[in-house]
């Protein structure tokens, strides 16, 4: 008995010593780290100021920091550069952390707006993508973790505190501080007819970038994804927002299928203890989705979704016209001011900042002319202007009444009425529409087949085949707007 007591006492002392020293047991997980990006961003640097030697050194430093960080916390870690990666490698690991760009296996047609493909459509390995890697590597797959804005600052907000990434296995200090709500978020909320508090609790993920780091481009700005339609499929979850230059619901940490977006792009050594723990927990959590593919694929990153209809209605108001006129004038004044400073500094032989260098070479722009409300509406939507003119209430009523029957135009950026659906009076996100369309096919009405092929990916020849498919899959069917205004099966 005395021996057992001594063993327990020794164990308690050892645990205490480990806690004090900051050490902890490694989590049993195999991780492949794919590096290749630097702790400086060439996009943010002045033209001609990128030092290739310094950039290469920064890549090496960041990879070393990530490798050390991961090996300290996981039992099996392999670190490679993006140029050495092939998708087949991920199958040997529980999770792949993408922090660098591999060699594309297929080049996209830039003239058609296509991106390069880095991962095959069949890719089902668990992956955590750091910052804009979500957009770079996931765009060709239809990843919802798209590039809404490369403007994620250093605070997380709107965290789902009950989510596993905030609760282990690595302990997270969730102590928040009250911080001012970002001005862009307040503006968007007003456009949406919503209100936000002037301050909200935020969690520090990493120290802010200094003025010198921002000016030189020696910083890694994070990326947020579009919230519109993000949650309209069962393979997604929003875990946290972040302080940024977009709406309050922009996605800073989220998951789409097997692809986990960790928007904060700072080096692990710069992350706070909470930030590091959340990243580690995200890697552990992502491993649970190994073998899962994307179900709803967002192939058009800018597709309009109905959750932003309030903003569409706001855009048809005099207030919106005044706002745009004022914004255009303010922006022009800012450009002229920076350009004047840049010219003066150049004439004096002084060094220009990256912003000044950009605006110095910018071609002369025509003067800003305020648009009348009628001119603004006519340019925005000529067809609706012919019907409603400058009647604000008529536009609002139009969108309110017809929203259930709307779908994107061919470009995907404007909502238009689907005449076949409107004629039936059944919303396109109501599964009764498919039942009715099959009935129309049975009656010989061509609208039935048109509707079925417009809102599903199936191409059956007979009503009986359509009905059999619908009856089998009905319990698992869902409607996705971000995925193309389609009825899909959760499988």
Predicted regions and their residues:
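Positively charged n-region of N-terminal signal peptides that target proteins for export
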Residues: 1-9
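Sec-dependent N-terminal signal peptides
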Residues: 9-18
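Short, flexible loop/turn segments with low-complexity composition
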Residues: 15, 292-305, 463-468, 481-485
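C-terminal segment of classical bacterial N-terminal signal peptides
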Residues: 18-24
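Extracellular ligand-binding/catalytic regions of CAZymes and related secreted enzymes
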Residues: 26-27, 231-404
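Helical hinge/lid and interdomain linker segments adjacent to catalytic or ligand-binding clefts
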Residues: 30-139, 426
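An acidic, glycine-rich "communication" segment
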Residues: 129-234
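Long, helix-rich interaction regions
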Residues: 153-161, 337-491
């Amino acid at each position: 008995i005395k021996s057992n007591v001594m063993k327990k006492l020794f164990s308690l002392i050892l645990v205490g010593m480990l806690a004090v020293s900051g050490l902890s047991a490694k989590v049993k997980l195999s991780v492949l780290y794919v590096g290749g990006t630097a702790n400086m961003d060439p996009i943010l640097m002045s033209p001609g100021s990128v030092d290739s030697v310094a950039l290469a050194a920064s890549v090496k430093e960041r990879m070393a920091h990530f490798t050390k960080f991961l090996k300290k916390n996981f039992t099996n870690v392999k670190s490679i550069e993006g140029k050495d990666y092939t998708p087949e490698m991920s199958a040997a690991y529980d999770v792949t952390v993408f922090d660098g760009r591999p060699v594309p296996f297929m080049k996209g047609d830039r003239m058609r707006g296509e991106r390069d493909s880095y991962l095959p459509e069949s890719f089902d390995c668990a992956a955590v993508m750091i910052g804009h890697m979500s957009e770079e590597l996931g765009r060709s797959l239809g990843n919802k973790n798209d590039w809404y804005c490369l403007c994620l600052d250093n605070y997380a907000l709107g965290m789902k505190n009950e989510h596993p990434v905030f609760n282990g296995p690595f302990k997270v200090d969730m102590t928040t501080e009250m911080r001012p709500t970002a001005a862009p978020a307040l503006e968007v909320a007003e456009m949406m007819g919503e209100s936000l508090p002037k301050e909200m609790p935020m969690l520090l993920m990493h120290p802010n970038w200094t003025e010198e780091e921002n000016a030189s481009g020696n910083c890694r700005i994070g990326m947020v994804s579009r919230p519109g339609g993000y949650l309209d499929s069962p393979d997604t979850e929003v875990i946290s927002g972040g302080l940024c230059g977009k709406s309050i619901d922009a996605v800073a940490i989220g998951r789409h299928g097997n692809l986990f977006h960790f928007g904060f792009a700072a080096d692990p050594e710069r992350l706070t203890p909470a930030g590091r723990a959340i990243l580690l927990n995200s890697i552990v959590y992502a491993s649970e989705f190994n073998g899962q593919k994307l179900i709803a694929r967002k192939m058009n990153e800018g597709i309009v979704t109905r959750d932003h209809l309030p903003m569409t209605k706001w855009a048809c108001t005099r207030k919106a016209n005044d706002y745009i006129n004022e914004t255009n004038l303010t922006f022009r004044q800012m450009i002229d001011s920076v350009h004047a400073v840049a010219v003066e500094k150049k004439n004096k032989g002084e060094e220009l900042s990256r912003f000044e260098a950009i605006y110095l070479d910018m071609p002369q722009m025509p003067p800003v002319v305020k648009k009348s409300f009628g001119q603004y509406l006519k340019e925005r939507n000529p067809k609706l202007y012919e019907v409603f003119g400058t009647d604000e209430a008529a536009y609002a009523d139009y969108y309110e009444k017809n929203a259930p029957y709307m779908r994107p135009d061919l470009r995907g950026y404007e909502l238009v009425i689907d005449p076949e659906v409107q004629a039936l009076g059944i919303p396109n996100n109501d599964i009764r529409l498919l039942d009715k369309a099959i009935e129309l096919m049975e009656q010989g009405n061509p609208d039935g087949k048109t509707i079925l092929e417009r809102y599903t990916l199936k191409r059956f020849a007979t009503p009986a085949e359509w009905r059999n498919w619908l009856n089998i899959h009905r319990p698992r069917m869902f409607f996705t707007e971000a995925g193309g205004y389609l009825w899909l099966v959760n499988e």
